[in-house]
Amino acid sequence: MAKTAPKENLIRLPEVQRKTGYSKAWIYKLISNGEFPKQVRLGSRSVAFIESEIGYWIAQRIAESRAA
């Protein structure tokens, strides 16, 4: 029986920008600072993000703002 990987949806940068309200430059700055989920390389000039990781990151930001 072949094992299958769990289904993960990949989303492109414009969708991440819509979900977060952040610019491309700010998202990449957060990634370089280790403060945002890293992208997945799809090809030599193509990347995407794991949708569940972005959703979790957003949920964490909401929880932090509610706790303050």
Q: What do these predicted regions represent?
A:
Residues 2-26, 32, 53-63:
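Polyanion-binding surface elements
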Residues 20-48:
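Major-groove DNA-recognition helix of helix-turn-helix-type DNA-binding domains
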